Amino acid sequence: HIIAMAKIAKAQNKKVFIHVITDGRDVAPDCAAVYINQLLEVCDDDIKIATIAGRYYAMDRDNRWDRVKKSFDAIAYSHPSTSCDILTYLKESYDSGVFDEFIIPSSFDEYDGLKENDGIIFCNFRSDRMREMSSVFANKNFSEFETIKNILNLATMTQYDKNTPIDVLFPKDAPINTLAEVISNAGLSQLHTAETEKYAHVTFFFNGGIEEPMLNETRVLIPSPSVSTYD
């Protein structure tokens, strides 16, 4: 879908800069080159790969803003920057023992950061993992670190957070009669509890994409330990 979006934007006479987020958790830890090569096949003067970052940085969901900022800096300010191409950067990272999930954010030579009136499309459809990064650009009251406020258009593949003012390309159909809803309608009580890292799974996702607790639903959030990785 990223390639399709890039082609659509190019057809509208737009310059396209792709910001790659490497996975390494839901797939093999060192398979990013497979997908990057697919992107490179469509790259030309109008479509370029601008930055790279492992999901450890770009897809944090536990308020570790120091990580998010590293990815944001690469996207917004092209800092830091490397003179090598993306595949060389990836190989050098592997050679140093850093694999896809933890790829250190960097921009590439031909990218010079965001400019006034640029637009951003968030192509990730994993809502809980993109709330923090999207809020950096869209939330005018964001205060965790200095950001930029002059992005002309913002859009997401799906709704990440209904409180974040971003256009949604593909709104979700809300499921009905979820387990939490049935329990609540039966007049029973329920408890949803998890660590911060998985809190969205037992609340937002479990309740069919609804943020607010059901009637007689209690939620308990246990702060996840502040560690680099849970391995």
Residue ranges: model-predicted function:
Residues 1-231:
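Feature captures the catalytic ectodomains and active-site-proximal regions of enzymes
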